[in-house]
């Protein structure tokens, strides 16, 4: 018997049909939707993130969307805390949390808990940035390779934010990020049914991504990014502006290349994101059932059967 309450994970790459399936499930099962998407958290970033429409949200309200301003920071630790709170609230109502999205790091944080990484320290970060201005980030990347070769191998020498964080962790704790991330936190107190949805043919996903990006442009994506660009308090190194599509449109607005090139690069970046998400899922160490994006009614029945079986055994 399952002593833990049940929750459902509906994972998958971008443009795989997660939202549509979640809305259908919300109509037929006692579930409430929690978004697991590091882009949907931002207010005012609706078109480029493919945020569910008002009509879709009326059918299936999503928790943890539109929760912070694009200038604010939000970590996997923030997500875990927020998601656990929402899951507990849903469970107390006698309903089932349905977690939907493609940010695999968030799912991992939920399932395994978080490593005891130190909180950010602005003084330490400022010192690292001063050092970078003097010697360059490539030099700091070499320093990181001596301290933490595993992290250094994973981090691009131009990725200033991640280099800064890895060095900051070492300077504060005296331990490398690799050492600390091997220590796991508290595990998720739920029995999880895990599903991943994607087209069997990768070419179909690529076509979906391209079609969706062009639809975003028609819906005013450039104008959405222009509003962010002209706010004056945002910049390209923020996680919000580094979201796929936004970064490329931002670079277009500052004159790096024309709109056609921005669209092309945005589509390529979205395809690369989807590839990374699928790679995460292929290497997922937990039991997972794959669903074909082209078989939505069949997918719905598979999840309903698994849900019913779990409820009977619980």
Curated annotation (Swiss-Prot):
A biological process term (GO) from this entry: tRNA modification
Region (Interaction with substrate tRNA): 37-40, 161-165, 242-247, 275-282
Binding site for substrate: 14-19
UniProt GO molecular function: ATP binding; tRNA dimethylallyltransferase activity
Keyword Protein biosynthesis (UniProt): no
Reactions accelerated catalytically: adenosine(37) in tRNA + dimethylallyl diphosphate = N(6)-dimethylallyladenosine(37) in tRNA + diphosphate
Cofactor: Mg(2+)
Gene3D superfamilies for the chain: 1.10.20.140, P-loop containing nucleotide triphosphate hydrolases
Keywords: ATP-binding, Magnesium, Nucleotide-binding, Transferase, tRNA processing
Binding site for ATP: 12-19
Enzyme Commission number, as recorded: 2.5.1.75
Protein family membership: Belongs to the IPP transferase family.
NCBIfam families: miaA
Protein name: tRNA dimethylallyltransferase
Source taxonomy: Bacteria, Pseudomonadati, Pseudomonadota, Gammaproteobacteria, Pasteurellales
Name of the encoding gene: miaA
């Amino acid at each position: 018997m399952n002593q833990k309450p049940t929750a459902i994970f509906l994972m998958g790459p971008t443009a795989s049909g997660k939202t549509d399936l979640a809305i259908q499930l919300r109509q037929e099962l006692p579930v409430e939707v929690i978004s697991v998407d590091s882009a949907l958290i931002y207010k005012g970033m609706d078109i480029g993130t493919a945020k569910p429409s008002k009509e879709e949200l009326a059918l299936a309200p999503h928790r943890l969307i539109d929760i912070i301003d694009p200038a604010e920071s939000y970590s996997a630790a923030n997500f875990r805390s927020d998601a656990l709170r929402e899951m507990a609230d849903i469970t107390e109502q006698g309903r089932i949390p349905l977690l939907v999205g493609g940010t695999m790091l968030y799912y991992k944080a939920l399932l395994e808990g978080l490593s005891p990484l130190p909180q950010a320290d602005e003084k330490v970060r400022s010192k690292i940035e001063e050092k970078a201005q003097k010697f360059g980030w490539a030099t700091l990347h070499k320093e990181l390779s001596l301290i933490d070769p595993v992290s250094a191998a994973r981090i691009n020498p131009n990725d200033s934010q991640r280099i800064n964080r890895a060095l900051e962790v070492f300077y504060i704790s005296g331990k490398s990020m690799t050492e600390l991330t091997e220590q796991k936190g508290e595990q998720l107190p739920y029995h999880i049914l895990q599903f991943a949805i994607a087209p069997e043919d990768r070419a179909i996903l690529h076509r979906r991504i391209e079609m969706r990006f062009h639809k975003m442009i028609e819906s005013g994506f450039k104008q959405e990014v222009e509003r962010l660009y002209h706010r004056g308090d945002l910049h390209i190194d923020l996680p919000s502006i580094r979201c796929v599509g936004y970064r490329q449109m931002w670079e277009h607005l500052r004159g790096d290349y024309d709109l056609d090139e921005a669209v092309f690069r945005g589509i390529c970046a979205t395809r690369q994101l989807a590839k990374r998400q699928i790679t995460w899922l292929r290497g997922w160490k937990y039991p997972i059932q794959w669903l074909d994006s082209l078989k939505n009614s069949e997918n719905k029945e598979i999840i309903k059967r698994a849900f019913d079986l779990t409820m009977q055994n619980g």
